[in-house]
Amino acid sequence: MSQRTLDVVFPDSGPLISLARGGHLDLLLRFKPEVRIIVADLVKHEVTRFPDKYEDSAALSRFFRENAARMEIAETELGQFIIAQMKSRDAYENAPPETKAVMETTGAVPPKPPRNRGEAVILTVARDIGRRHPDDVMLIFAEDRYFLSESRFAERHTHILSTRAFLEGLARKNIISFDAVWADIVAKRPNAVAQSVDRRAPDIETDWESAIDEGR
């Protein structure tokens, strides 16, 4: 990848949930120590908000806690605003019936967070990284169609990678058995995105596989 620093950016929750449900979050630590692993604040909140309810949320909460030195959380004003909205809505949804009734009567029901909320947040994150580290390559690790679509997301110095393509790359290096790991994932998450997308940046040559530590 010709001396450029690689920033692995998670703009949507899909890859994290897939790897967590399959029991393979540790594969993210295959990136070399100099690689920045960046998770949007909204994405982290979404995948860790119900640790007492979902196994994958508990696994991700533990993973973030145990690897805090490795995982960089990108905070944005918009992300923090939407997180506050989500917390308010969750509090309402989990409130006792009498509390809900009062909130509904007084018009104090929190609004539902906007759909497609992650797109604006990741654009903010991507542009912030581009401003602070203009020579870095961003590896957008995603399952959302917005990011995997060739015509939708095309920031400079940006390489797009789907979960399946990531696993295929590790298999080419004989780090994993693709069939075994993918079977673990789809057994717990049948709707995991099966699309293999490994799209290089349009403006420079990029190669994420050279940032994988094969010696662990």
Where would I find each of the regions flagged by the language model?
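Active-site-proximal, substrate-binding regions of enzyme catalytic domains
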Residues: 2-138, 148-216
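Short, well-ordered beta-to-alpha junction loops that form the rim of enzyme active sites
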Residues: 141-145
